[in-house]
Amino acid sequence: MNRVGAVFLFVYERNFFLSIVPDRHRTEIRMSSSERSEVKFDKHFNWWSLLGIAFSLSCSWVGISASMAVGIASGGPLLIIYGLIIAAFFSLMCGISLGDFAAILPNSSGGSFWVLKMLEQESVTLKTPEYEDPSDDDEEVFLENYCQTFNVEVSSKFQKVSSMVVGLLNYFGAIFTTASICSSLSMSCIGIHKLLHPDYELKHWHVFVGYECINAVLTLFNIYSTPLPYISQFGLYTSLLSFAMTFIICIVSRSDNTVDPWPKASNIFGSFDNQTGWNSSGMAFVVGLVNPIWAFVGIDSATHMIDEVGYSKSRFLVPKVIITTIIVGFVTSFIYCVGLFFCITDQTAVVESILPIVEIFYQATGNRNLSVFLQCMCITTGFVSGIASGTWQSRILQSFGKSYAPFYKEGSLGNKSLKKLAVLTPGFKSPLYAHFLSQICVTIIGCIFMGSSTAFNAIITACITLLLMSYAVPSFIFLFVIKKEKFIHRIESDVNCVSRPNRRRMSMIPHIICILWTLFCLVFLSFPYTLPVTAGNMNYTSVVYAVVFCIISIVVFPTCI
């Protein structure tokens, strides 16, 4: 028997042994062979395209400039500079914890699959095949079958519900991320118009119209999956080029200004400007952290591209991409912020501006047209970020549908709906149902919030905290619910029998920090951004949480009956 045949024999034997375990002890997830043989993704993502989609999505230097209004009002340049250091450190810890899981259990469902696998209680001991010299094909086939939901023994409602909740938290976090990108791009376009027409008065419906138009255009780019690796690489190169050009042009242009003196370093690194109304500068600093934290949103995107990378390669590529994205994001955003803050000649005008970054460009260059050009480069980069976010959210929903359709009664609405979301449309090789449903959700969010600045803050806070919760739950289960040493030994003994060993040690420290950071953000980012609190400036993030958990309850409840 050849090696590939032996791998399939292992999967068959596992299902046979599980089938003899009494039903009262387990609920096996089963999918028909026809469901498993449907259209699959092409494995056409490599290191550069995977890094491209991850970095294009977070795009820290653009994120920090697009949401600068909150940070500037909460503490000025000092908050953003030191906030970036804080956000980068904790994001790195979260990234390491994600990389730990992705290295041993590659699956496009990400955290939801890891939770499902960690809570698995094996009733029988299965012997895995051993090879003297396994080939790459053997390794890929084995991992693709081993790291699938239909090969996980589901023995409790807690296991089932926990994994689904994590998957849905991750998905809604991605949805709100796309919404925040559309909103920031709309504000960027309006900021250009304001610069060229100083008498312009901002209306909320202007932001709303721009939001919906941008969302409609972004929808078109994820219909075909074939160009996505090239778009991702284009986004990576465009982002780095735009960063370099805008930074250099601003610094050089500011150097030619002999009228206005350079700001003192003490004003940038040591002066805290609290305009929030909070009496406590510490509290003002904390609520303003939403700006630098948003610069590192979506660091898990690479974990959801496993099907388009390959299960074998992803064990090594995904952790490296996550860490590289965070490090490069911090370096570019930190340099960018420090440089541009030295270009400010009138901080009051920056604070009062519709879009502070455009005002900084104008103060640095003294030329409206050149400032518009620089902002257009940022918009182009942000547009690719929106495409990457659309890819990310559709992959989460597609993998969720594929993994959890069997949890529902065959023929039920939930079963049929998730099966539909899992389908890849032939010819497009893209999950169009998942993609269009996700874009509709983004459209609905825009209709609810109608372009208010308070709504934008709630959107970016929701995307931060929902994603962090989806990162923290697997870490919490790994540390405090299961016997972690036994789990690691079991996975390594299963996977490394055919796959090349991955010598990663899962340290407790990043997982503990990830949990604590999530709790911190969940509590403190829910406080009002400014005082006194009115209906217009209230932090509505808690309302978002309530709605999201109501929807999650409706989706998950039928699986518990």
Swiss-Prot record:
GO terms for molecular function: gamma-aminobutyric acid transmembrane transporter activity; transmembrane transporter activity. InterPro entries: AA/rel_permease1. Its main location: membrane. GO terms for cellular component: endoplasmic reticulum; membrane. Keywords: Membrane, Transmembrane, Transmembrane helix, Transport. The chain crosses the membrane at residues 50-70, 78-98, 161-181, 205-225, 231-251, 282-302, 322-342, 370-390, 440-460, 462-482, 508-528, 541-560. Residues 71-77, 182-204, 252-281, 343-369, 461, 529-540 are extracellular. It is found in: Membrane. Residues 1-49, 99-160, 226-230, 303-321, 391-439, 483-507, 561 are cytoplasmic. Gene3D superfamilies: Amino acid/polyamine transporter I. GO terms for biological process: biotin biosynthetic process; gamma-aminobutyric acid transport; vitamin transport. The keyword Transmembrane helix applies. It is a multi-pass membrane protein. Belongs to the amino acid-polyamine-organocation (APC) superfamily. Transport into the cell of 7-keto 8-aminopelargonic acid. This is 7-keto 8-aminopelargonic acid transporter. It comes from Saccharomyces cerevisiae (strain ATCC 204508 / S288c). The gene is BIO5.
